[in-house]
């Protein structure tokens, strides 16, 4: 039986992290030794911005109707539209709750042998809810740029992971 590798992602839109995730998934799929799954919380676009090998399974945890509403929330705040601000705040809380809940459910119930996490909050969830039988890898793409709080958050988030990979030099 082939081993399964899952890569956790916030979304598959534009960005260096997203490009790296897809590049890794495609490279692993081409080896033909593993079943590869990208698990994306948000589906921001109908089709991924980057080409994904047909052997890579992509799973979206939230419907495309539930996507970040930061822009709408900021506009309501900036324009002092209090009713809109209240609605957008509630929507934001709902999205964040579902984002967390859906990823926890995936991590708890997956049959993946290896899970690669790509963000601090995903490291935290993988650390807390990942099975002891699963190889857990954190993969950090951001440089801390002398932001010690961020560096501390990263360090704290990986304490229960098996491995940690830094993309940029610290």
Task: Pin down the residues of each PLM region.
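An amphipathic, basic-hydrophobic alpha-helix
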Residues: 74-114, 152
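Histidine-centered beta-alpha loop that forms part of the nucleotide-sugar donor binding/catalytic region
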Residues: 10, 63, 119-120, 140-143
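A short, active-site helix/loop in glycosyltransferases that binds the activated sugar's phosphate group
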Residues: 125-126, 162-170
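Membrane-proximal helix-turn-helix segments that form the acceptor-binding/catalytic region
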Residues: 101-109, 143-166
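Short His-centered aromatic/hydrophobic patch
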Residues: 96, 117-122
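N-terminal strand-loop element at the rim of the active site
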Residues: 7-14, 27, 31-90
């Amino acid at each position: 039986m082939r081993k399964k590798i899952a890569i956790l992602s916030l979304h598959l839109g534009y960005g260096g992290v997203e490009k790296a995730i897809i590049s890794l998934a495609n490279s692993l799929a081409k080896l033909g030794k593993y079943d590869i799954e990208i698990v994306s919380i948000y589906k921001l676009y109908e089709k991924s911005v980057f080409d994904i090998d047909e052997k890579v399974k992509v799973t979206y945890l939230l419907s495309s109707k539930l996507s970040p509403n930061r822009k709408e929330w900021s506009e309501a705040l900036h324009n002092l539209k209090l009713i809109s601000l209240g609605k957008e705040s509630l929507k934001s809380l709902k999205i964040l709750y579902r984002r967390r809940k859906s990823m926890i459910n995936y991590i708890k119930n997956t049959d993946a042998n290896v899970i690669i996490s790509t963000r601090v909050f995903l490291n935290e969830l993988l650390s807390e809810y990942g099975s002891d039988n699963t190889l857990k890898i954190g993969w950090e793409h951001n440089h801390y740029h002398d932001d010690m709080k961020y560096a501390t958050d990263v360090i704290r988030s990986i304490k229960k992971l098996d491995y940690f990979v830094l993309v940029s030099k610290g």
